[in-house]
């Protein structure tokens, strides 16, 4: 079926005789292929009648050679072509009717009638473009075949129009033209012939390139062009871009050729990920794109290399030799420095009045291109290099840029100059759109090799400035082009955190060479400087929005903790006024930037100081001035952020944070003054800020509370009331952001109470009574209604997360009915039909089960366990993962209760429920890794919790065996390292249960074997550490089984210690000391338990070649004991419940015990015992000598001092 689309040609410009004037590029934001789904409208009566009459007339005609038919067709074609279909809505014209008209017309026009063929092709192009139609397959087949025959048989003077019609036919249909591609793109294809840069006829060449561009367009539901035609198109497009302008070709015509080639390249790149093949060199493509980014840019002339090469060092372009200016331009060059400076700042204020009430449309493009000097370099030290007329060539620095107005031109000359500038700007814009497609389809790690070609690393003082994306953002006279360069820069910066993390300039600069980290840091500083200049100089609201978005991407990815402070302060001061800008998009973007500033690597000391500064207007006066801060641009009567945070109203340094007060006022208070036409939204009566502004302000508040809670805690109750107000509004998005803010407030309080008692953070804790007041007001407000709002499951999910952020100490002081209400609602939501709500409720119960006031309540623990077990069988992997995490927390509670409450809790807890938990955890240990990692943690706790009463029941026998088998298989398996780490920890946890038959059970041999294998062979040192810790858990010799099992464990630990520094991954070395310490503790533990039957294996181990290494490592462990952090000290995993034994005490007690065995009748031979004793005595003696030497050395040092 035929369909309607938004066509490239629909906004193209053509002359009356069919000659193409040029093609306007689609905007950067709008795809050319957009299906229309508009409501039906009444058609213009004359147009509808004309289409209907012409259609009926064509259907009544039959092919013949009569002159009357030719006359009739001429009249019909003239009528159809003369109608301006783009002037009104013609959605009611069925595409099928248009297709039938074109097919019937092609049957009536023989290939011998070339004048009629020209008109038919014009009609095809106009109807399809202006009515925005993609033809169906039948029409495509008929008309493409007709055009192909016409290209083969008709005179060459017709080919330009035929190709133009063909381009409209193949638009969006490239994948359906497979049978015609050999004739079009084969070795002797017509498009290959006419699209070649050597083609002398520029009209044919332009039409062919345009046709190739439309063939490259990929439609999501259809396959892309196949090889070798895909490569043929790329080659033609690239060669077109690399070619020079023929001397006899008009500049505007050449611009339209370039624009078609760039648009085709953009379509090509949108077809899929970039693949490095021999005939597609990324460096060559980037070179031409960079060249056309500056095409016709006033004051810029550059000779670009044919290929850009990836390199960390900057690549410099060469500036051609300067030619003298003509004499008639001398008066314009003699302006004073003061007048030039005044003129350079025109973008800041002068353009405000003219462009106040309209968008940056095409008319604005022309006026902007023909306006005065808008050079963004006016604030930089390099401005004189690019704005001085004496530096650039006459061709690329036209006189319009140097004159005070366009009135010095004659009308025709001025019109052509403006038109040329507009077409050149379109080329620059198309090049940037193409580069944006490159950024999206090429892997970032490859693209970052060309970073220095597009991002500056120095301001260029004393020489030509580097030509980069910032050059366009500051220099280009058209707002759309400036915005395009900022879009590309934003795309480059997005996701660049890992690349930029290597930047560093905190240390002293090196003189011998500049490392890449310093070069990258200089590039980051130059980006801050350049974008700040663009922010100050920009007057277009749309482009200003892009500047702020680009800055937000930059701030979100820069490693400020590795750079010298001072980058954020100038930026902070300049963006504050934009929160009150007249344009809503600017206000939203400025808040987004504030959100990035307070969330990046929080808390940053520099941002902390900026947040504590008073919010008076005087603070804005320091630094670089803001041109837009004028009475015409800003709302003056009620600057709420200034009133709320002024020095008179503020509470001193400890008063409310000015940014917090600003965001609260944006959410709650009505706007006092009208905004620009771009504002939308509001409410009846006193309108609030538009919804996007309020949502972004709430987002900033959430980031501020999360990163800088100490500054927000003074307004805790006020923020709680704000969140409650948001929850009562009708807008679901506002409700959701209000709930999110509540969650961040609760989390901030919990983080304060988790801090050590002796830290500054703990000293400024919110008092518990204030926390109780806060939650009492919140839970007495609309939060409960939000939890019960089944029509808004996303809000329910967020409200569950909010409930889970209540401070345990505060929860226990809430009224009993409030506690019961929270628990009841959460238990009920675990049976919700929405998986997100169910997952959030189960997670919240997993938090509550750790509360001291709830964990000893057997009924609550049982109800929570049943809810978790039900969720553990859910279809959703996310629900099962949250349920497994909660089950791990619940079993942690069982262990705590076993140690604190004792038998009373264990006797009251249901055996059947415990059995179900064991079975469910065993089943979950075979699930996805997200579920498995917590399931094995729960298994370890459950096996630790089992008592003799449970183990004596036959019903527990098989589940116990299956649980142990699951843990052993997980340790040996190929799961993620986190899962295996938890499995090793779980086995060690199970070994702590003295009631388990560890030494005699069938599974004990397999468990020790699995741990012994892991401790010697696992690549991950943290897994090795936990397996060594598990092997050292059993408290008695009987738990290790027979002497063969004991010797296997010993040999594995000794071998692991001897090879503890061998690893394939350099990152594992950070855990090397912890691994050696844990292995030494395990070996000493086994020595303390060894019996005479174990001595042969121990003696052979310590008397061989490994003896010196083992001795040295044990001595080192004894010396450093207590200094080496234990495994898991990075906070990612739970620590062992037991305290490590003192190594020196353990060693000396073992030595004394073994000496007592000498001469005992139980010993058949003292040789093995003497070997072990000799080894231990050497360790003790060498350690004591080392300590004595260290003591003497310390005494000498003290004596000298």
Curated annotation (Swiss-Prot):
UniProt KW Glycosyltransferase keyword: no
Gene3D superfamilies tied to this protein: Leucine-rich Repeat Variant (1.25.10.10)
Repeat region (HEAT), residues: 182-221, 460-498, 523-560, 566-603
Biased composition (Basic residues): 341-352
Source organism per UniProt: Danio rerio
Pfam families registered for this protein in UniProt: DUF4042, HEAT_EZ
Keywords recorded for this protein, A-Z: Repeat
Protein name as catalogued: HEAT repeat-containing protein 6
Positions of the UniProt region annotated as Disordered: 1-25, 321-390, 618-653
Compositionally biased region (Polar residues): 375-390, 618-633
């Amino acid at each position: 079926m035929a369909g309607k689309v938004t066509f490239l040609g629909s906004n193209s410009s053509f002359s009356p005789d069919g000659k193409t004037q040029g093609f306007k590029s689609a905007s950067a934001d709008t795809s050319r292929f957009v299906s229309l789904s508009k409501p039906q409208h009444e058609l213009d009566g004359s147009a509808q009648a004309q289409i209907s009459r012409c259609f009926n007339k064509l259907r009544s005609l039959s092919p013949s050679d009569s002159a009357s038919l030719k006359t009739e067709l001429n009249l019909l074609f003239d009528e159809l072509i003369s109608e301006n279909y783009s002037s009104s809505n013609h959605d009611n014209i069925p595409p099928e009717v248009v297709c039938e008209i074109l097919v019937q017309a092609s049957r009536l026009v023989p290939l011998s009638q070339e004048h009629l063929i020209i008109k038919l092709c014009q009609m095809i192009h106009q109807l399809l473009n202006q009515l925005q139609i993609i033809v169906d397959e039948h029409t495509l087949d008929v008309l493409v075949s007709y055009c192909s025959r016409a290209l083969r048989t008709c005179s060459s003077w017709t080919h330009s129009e035929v190709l133009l019609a063909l381009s409209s036919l193949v638009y969006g249909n490239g994948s359906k033209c497979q049978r015609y591609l050999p004739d079009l793109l084969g070795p002797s294809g017509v498009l290959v012939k006419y699209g070649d840069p050597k083609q002398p006829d520029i009209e044919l060449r332009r039409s062919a390139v345009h046709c190739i561009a439309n063939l490259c367009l990929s439609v999501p539901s259809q396959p892309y062009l196949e090889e070798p035609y895909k490569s043929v198109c790329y080659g033609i497009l690239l060669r077109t871009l690399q070619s020079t302008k023929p001397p006899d070709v008009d500049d505007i015509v050449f611009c339209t050729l370039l624009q078609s080639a760039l648009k085709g390249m953009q379509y090509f790149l949108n077809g899929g990920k970039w693949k490095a093949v021999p005939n597609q060199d990324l460096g060559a493509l980037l070179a031409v794109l960079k060249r056309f980014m500056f095409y016709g840019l006033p004051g810029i002339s550059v000779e670009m290399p044919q290929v850009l090469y990836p390199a960390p060092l900057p690549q410099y372009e060469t500036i051609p030799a300067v030619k003298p200016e003509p004499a008639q331009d001398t008066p314009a060059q003699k302006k004073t420095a003061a007048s030039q400076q005044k003129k350079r700042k025109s973008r800041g204020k002068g353009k405000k009045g003219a462009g106040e009430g309209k968008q940056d449309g095409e008319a604005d493009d022309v006026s902007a291109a023909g306006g005065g000097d808008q050079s963004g370099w006016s604030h930089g030290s390099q401005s004189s290099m690019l704005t001085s007329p004496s530096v650039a060539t006459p061709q690329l620095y036209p006189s319009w840029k140097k004159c005070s107005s366009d009135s010095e031109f004659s009308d025709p000359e001025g019109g052509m100059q403006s038109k040329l500038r507009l077409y050149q700007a379109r080329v620059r814009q198309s090049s940037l759109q193409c580069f944006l497609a490159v950024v999206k389809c090429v892997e970032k790690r490859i693209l970052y090799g060309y970073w220095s070609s597009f991002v500056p690393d120095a301001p260029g003082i004393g020489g030509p400035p580097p030509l980069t994306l910032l050059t366009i953002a500051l220099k280009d006279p058209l707002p759309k082009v400036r915005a395009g360069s900022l879009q590309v820069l934003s795309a480059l910066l997005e996701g660049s955190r890992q690349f930029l993390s290597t930047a560093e300039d905190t240390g002293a600069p090196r003189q011998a060479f500049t490392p890449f980290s310093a070069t990258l840091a200089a590039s980051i500083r130059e980006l801050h400087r350049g974008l700040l200049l663009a922010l100050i100089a920009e007057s277009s609201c749309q482009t200003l929005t892009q500047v702020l978005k680009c800055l937000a991407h930059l701030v979100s990815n820069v490693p400020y903790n590795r750079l010298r402070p001072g980058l954020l302060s100038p930026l902070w001061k300049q963006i504050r006024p934009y929160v009150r800008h007249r344009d809503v998009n600017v206000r939203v973007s400025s808040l987004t930037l504030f959100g990035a500033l307070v969330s990046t690597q929080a808390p940053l000391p520099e941002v902390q100081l900026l947040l504590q500064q008073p919010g008076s207007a005087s603070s804005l006066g320091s630094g670089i001035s803001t041109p837009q801060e004028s009475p015409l641009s800003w709302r003056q009567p009620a600057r709420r952020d200034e009133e709320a945070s002024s020095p008179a109203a503020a509470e001193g340094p400890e008063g409310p944070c000015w940014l917090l007060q600003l965001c609260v006022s944006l959410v709650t208070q009505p706007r006092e003054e009208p905004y620009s036409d771009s504002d939308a939204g509001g409410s009846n009566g006193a309108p609030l800020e538009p919804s996007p502004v309020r949502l972004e302000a709430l987002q900033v508040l959430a980031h501020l509370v999360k990163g800088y809670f100490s500054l927000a805690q003074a307004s805790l109750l006020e923020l709680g009331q704000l969140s409650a107000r948001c929850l009562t509004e009708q807008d679901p998005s506002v409700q959701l952001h209000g709930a999110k803010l509540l969650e961040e407030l609760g989390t901030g309080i919990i983080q304060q109470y988790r801090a050590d008692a002796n830290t500054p953070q703990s000293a400024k804790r919110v008092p518990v009574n204030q926390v109780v007041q806060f939650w009492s007001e919140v839970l007495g407000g609309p939060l409960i209604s939000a939890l019960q709002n089944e029509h808004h499951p996303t809000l329910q999910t967020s409200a569950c997360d909010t409930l889970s952020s209540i401070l345990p100490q505060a929860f226990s002081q809430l009224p009993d009915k409030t506690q019961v209400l929270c628990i009841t609602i959460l238990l009920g939501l675990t049976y919700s039909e929405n998986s997100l709500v169910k997952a959030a409720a189960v997670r919240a119960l997993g938090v509550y089960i750790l509360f001291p006031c709830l964990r000893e309540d057997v009924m609550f623990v049982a109800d929570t366990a049943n809810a978790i077990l039900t969720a553990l069988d859910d279809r959703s992997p996310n629900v099962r993962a949250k349920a497994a995490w909660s089950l791990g927390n619940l079993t942690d509670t069982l262990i705590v209760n076993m140690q604190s409450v004792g038998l009373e809790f264990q006797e009251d807890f249901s055996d059947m429920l415990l059995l179900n938990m064991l079975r469910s955890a065993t089943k979950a240990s075979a699930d996805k890794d997200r579920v498995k990692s917590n399931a094995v943690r729960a298994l370890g706790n459950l096996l630790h919790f089992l008592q003799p009463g449970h183990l004596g029941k036959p019903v527990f026998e098989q589940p116990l065996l299956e649980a142990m088998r699951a843990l052993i298989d997980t340790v040996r398996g190929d799961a993620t390292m986190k899962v295996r780490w938890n499995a090793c920890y779980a086995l060690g946890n199970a070994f702590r249960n003295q009631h388990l038959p560890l030494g005699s059970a069938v599974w004990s041999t397999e468990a020790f074997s699995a741990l012994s294998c892991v401790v010697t062979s696992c690549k991950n040192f943290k897994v090795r550490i936990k397996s060594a810790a598990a092997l050292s858990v059993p408290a008695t010799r009987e738990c290790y089984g027979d002497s063969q099992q004991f010797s296997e464990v010993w040999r594995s630990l000794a071998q692991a210690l001897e090879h503890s520094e061998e690893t394939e991954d350099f990152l594992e070395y950070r855990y090397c000391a912890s691994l050696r310490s844990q292995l030494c503790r395990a070996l000493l533990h086994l020595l303390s338990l060894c019996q005479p039957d174990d001595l042969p294996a121990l003696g052979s181990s310590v008397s061989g070649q490994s003896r010196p290494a083992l001795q040295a490592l044990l001595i080192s462990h004894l010396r450093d004991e207590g200094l080496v952090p234990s495994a898991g000290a990075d906070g990612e995993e739970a620590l062992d419940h037991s305290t490590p034994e003192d190594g020196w005490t353990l060693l000396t007690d073992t030595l004394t015990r073994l000496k007592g065995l000498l001469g005992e009748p139980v010993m058949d031979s003292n040789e093995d015992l003497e070997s072990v004793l000799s080894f231990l005595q050497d360790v003790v003696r060498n350690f004591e000598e080392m300590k004595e030497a260290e003591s003497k050395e310390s005494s000498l040092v003290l004596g000298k001092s």
